[in-house]
Swiss-Prot record:
Record protein name field: Kelch-like protein diablo
Pathway: Protein modification; protein ubiquitination
Family matches, as PROSITE patterns: BTB
Molecular function GO terms recorded: actin binding; ubiquitin-like ligase-substrate adaptor activity
Location of region: Disordered: 1-55
GO biological process: negative regulation of synaptic assembly at neuromuscular junction; proteasome-mediated ubiquitin-dependent protein catabolic process; protein ubiquitination
Source organism: Drosophila virilis
Functional description taken from the UniProt entry: Probable substrate-specific adapter of an E3 ubiquitin-protein ligase complex which mediates the ubiquitination and subsequent proteasomal degradation of target proteins. May have a role in synapse differentiation and growth.
Length: 624
């Protein structure tokens, strides 16, 4: 088998296809009373079971053609000014709404023309098309009419896809509108996500026009939350007063109702007296003055505080920004890809972000100074020495990083002492032992001591101030050897080898061990895994992953170890699995949007806002 990460190699083994050619050298139908083999056997009934994969699609296509030609149609839907011809049985099979209409005792069950009110005619046509084609495009221009129409017709799949589209559109300027829309149409999951987004990004949301237009009830719902992400309670007070002063004449009557949910006892004494207590609107309202006095007593009488505890004295506890994992580039279905996606363990969702400017498989990925670096790789035609850098706050890649001194694919990349190291790989001519490091302050690469062994498909890890180069291939065969670099001495030394030869393995530091998983040995892709204890200089096995994975990414996110993508010997993988060290077990936990072999992974803190997701303004539902 060829190396699946090298250009020109399919990565496909002999597999089951090779076994499909019989082994006897003879052929026959098995029918009739011809010859026998060995002992006499009783005749078996002739049977061939077949399930057509084409049949559902072909049938839908033909039914849709009948509809388009208005043949065998037995109902006409009058929606707005439009007449939509259809077949009752198709509508009833797809929609509980139509099933109840046409199979019960309703008057419509006996009518050939049915008028449906309170639904957008364009949305209805799209939904009827979906019933016949299983295909729909949800986009910004139609989602607000599609969702209520899907709710009316009880098309749950379309409701879900509309909610998914709106989740991807969330940003601080529209999250309140999406929240209200979700509430109106009883989309609980979208409402929950919009609520969390609003709480998490409150400092940006409070500056939006949507915030100033909130009804008083929704404003109270938001500022009541313990999860509100603010630096201090002063921000909540300022937000409330901005909302009030947007329309003082109508809103001043609600000031006390709203102010009771601002945690005035948590304000600084200076702000409470100088800003809140001196505000003319606050001073003119007796209930507001009582709230200010309550806060003053709390601040002035610390010995009485145990008796004064309540919702207004409880500090807010916003959810901390967790870590997220980025999957970068790789090899998918026979080609290098530039796509990048982000995994959030809190929601278990993969979202697309901005792609790189170049396709890169065998790319090295690491995070330095809160920026994600993609180093080298192969674009399907050429070996690369270029580098791209991703800023999650702007969702943009830049190409202003100095290139490495040589082209590298299947390269190991890691960060040590503020430098970005590129280790081994191959340049299209030979397997490399070269090592160089990047200084972000100087935007410059410089060579350091080479490894003692040439290594492509090498895994690298940083532990206790040392850089480890683990496994890989010397260009002839996979390696189990490991060496360690000391930057103070600029020297590589060997440490104990792994128990298994591995190239294109995944590697990460977890709980002060170096974990090495998957890869490929001389014969096959591996699911086995082991870990290195630097204190004893020993490797010990752990339980194998659920899948064989060569070209796998391995990373620690929020204290959990994730294995991402790879190649199992017959297929590129988009599955991920997570390891539990207490139970010594791996479990599958979702899928990426893209299959990835030889993609890089990097872990960063989640950005302050979620408004950077890379997606088209449309969401296509078709054979997903």
């Amino acid at each position: 088998m060829g190396d699946p990460l090298l250009p020109g190699s399919t990565g496909l083994g002999s597999g089951p296809a090779a076994a499909a050619t019989g082994g006897s050298g003879t052929t026959g139908t098995g029918l009739g009373s011809g010859g026998t083999s060995g002992a006499e056997r009783p005749p078996s009934p002739a049977r061939l079971t077949h399930t057509s994969e084409k049949h559902p699609k072909v049938t839908l296509t033909e039914l849709n053609m009948l509809r388009r030609h208005r043949e065998l149609c037995d109902v006409v839907l009058n929606v707005g000014g439009r007449k939509i011809f259809a077949h009752r049985v198709i509508l009833s099979a797809c929609s509980s709404y139509f099933c109840a209409m046409f199979t019960g005792e309703l008057e419509e069950s006996r009518q050939t023309e049915v008028t449906i009110r309170d639904i957008d005619e364009n949305a209805m046509e799209l939904l009827i098309d979906f019933c016949y084609t299983a295909h729909i495009i949800v986009e910004e221009s139609n989602v607000q009419t599609l969702l209520p129409a899907a709710c009316l017709l009880q098309l749950v799949e379309i409701q879900d896809i509309c909610c998914e589209f709106l989740k991807r559109q969330l940003d601080p300027t529209n999250c309140l509108g999406i929240r209200a829309f979700a509430d109106t149409h009883s989309c609980r999951e979208l409402l929950r996500i919009a609520d969390k987004f609003t709480q998490h990004n409150f400092q940006e949301v409070m500056e939006s026009e949507e915030f100033l237009l909130l009804p008083v009830g929704q404003l109270v719902d938001i500022i009541c939350s313990d999860e509100l992400n603010v630096r201090s309670e002063e921000q909540v007070f300022n937000a409330v007063m901005s909302w009030l002063k947007y329309n003082v004449a109508e809103r001043r009557q609600h000031l006390a109702q709203v102010l009771q949910h601002v945690r005035l006892p948590l304000l600084s004494p200076k702000f409470l007296v100088g800003t809140v207590g001196s505000d003319l609107l606050v001073r003119s309202d007796e209930a507001c003055r009582d709230l200010v006095d309550e806060a003053k007593n709390y601040l002035l009488l610390p010995q009485e505080r145990p008796l004064m505890q309540g919702p207004r004295t409880r500090p807010r506890k916003p959810t901390r920004r967790g870590e997220v994992l980025f999957a970068v580039g790789g090899w998918c279905s026979g080609d290098a890809i530039a796509s990048v996606e982000r995994f959030d363990p809190q929601t278990n969702d993969w979202k697309m972000v901005a792609p790189m400017s170049k396709r890169r498989c065998g790319v090295g990925v690491a995070v330095l100074n809160d920026l994600l670096y993609a180093v080298g790789g192969h674009d399907g035609q050429s070996y690369l020495n270029s580098i791209e850098r991703y800023d999650p706050q702007t969702n943009q890649w830049s190409c202003d990083v100095a290139p490495t001194t040589s082209c590298r694919t299947s390269v190991g990349v890691a960060v040590l002492d503020g430098f970005l190291y590129a280790v081994g790989g191959q340049d299209g001519v030979q397997c490399l032992n070269h090592v160089e490091r990047y200084d972000p302050k100087e935007n410059k690469w410089s060579k350091v001591a080479p490894m003692t062994t040439r290594r492509l498909g090498v895994a690298v890890a940083v532990l206790s101030g040392h850089l480890y180069a683990i496994g890989g291939s010397d260009g002839q065969c996979p390696l189990n050897t490991v060496e360690r670099y000391d930057p103070r001495q600029n020297k590589w030394v060997a440490v104990n080898p792994m128990s298994t030869r591995r190239k294109h393995l995944g590697c990460a530091v977890f709980n002060n061990y170096i974990y090495a998983v998957g890869g490929r040995d001389d014969c096959m892709e591996l699911s086995s895994a082991e870990r290195y204890n630097p204190l004893t200089n020993t490797w010990s096995p752990i339980v194998a992953m659920t899948s064989r994975r060569s070209g796998v990414g391995l990373a620690v996110v929020n204290g959990q170890l994730y294995a991402v993508g790879g190649f199992d010997g017959s297929a590129y993988l988009k599955t991920i699995e997570v390891y539990d060290p207490e139970t010594n077990q791996w479990r599958l936990c979702g899928c990426m949007n893209y299959r990835r072999l030889g993609g890089g992974v990097g872990v960063m803190r989640a950005p302050q806002t979620e408004n950077y997701m890379w997606c088209d303004n449309s969401f296509l539902l078709h054979d997903r």
